[in-house]
Amino acid sequence: MELVKETIRRVIQIIFGTFIFDCPGLNKIRNVIYRFMFMSYGKKNIVSKKVMFYVPHGAKKAKINIGDLVRISEDVTIDCTSDITISDNVWISEHTHIMNHEHIICGKEWKKSKNIKTTSGLELQEDCWIGAGTLILPQVTQIGKGAIVGAGSVVTKNIDDYEIVAGNPARHIGYRE
C-alpha cells in the first residue's frame, strides 16, 4: 500500500512540478497541493519546477515541515525517509540533492530495499542558504541558522550557525558577520 501511495505522490509532483505551474497564479495551485502533502507548509513559499520529495524503496513516509518564505529552486531532490524540517527563509538552490538514508552492505549478497538505514532526520535552520549542485549526505542532521553552503559542495557533517562551508567534502571557510 505504501508503494501505491508513493507512486501517486510522485505522479502528482511530476504533473504539478512542470513549467506550466510556474506561471503567475498557477503556482498557487502547486502550493495548495503541497499543503496537503506535508505536515506543515508555510506561507509565501516558492517551489520551482522539477522539485521531488520522495520516499524511496517503499519506506514509511516521514514528517515534512516547511516554514515561511522558503525558496526551493528547480531540479531539487529531497529524500523523505526521515523527518525533515525546513525553517523560515531557507533557500535551496537548483540541482541540490538531500539524502536521508543509506544502504547497509554485509556479505556478498544484499537486497537494496531491505538493508536501509535511516537517519534521525535533518533540520535546515532559519536563514540558511544551500548553493547550487550541493549534495547533503545522510549523516548530516543539521545545517545551522544563517549557514551558507557553497555551490557544488558535498556536506558530510553538521554545519554550525552562521558557518560558511564549501568543497568536496565541505570544509569550513569562515563565519558570517
PLM regions: where:
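Terminal amphipathic alpha-helical/low-complexity segments used for targeting or macromolecular assembly
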Residues: 1-44, 96, 102-115, 127, ...
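Flexible, glycine/small-residue-enriched loop-and-beta-strand segment within the central core
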Residues: 49-67, 71-143, 168-169, 176-177
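Glycine-centered loop/turn positions within well-structured domains
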Residues: 84, 153, 161-163, 171
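A generic "structured core" feature
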Residues: 129, 148, 153-154
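Short helix N-cap motif at coil->helix boundaries in the Bergerat
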Residues: 157
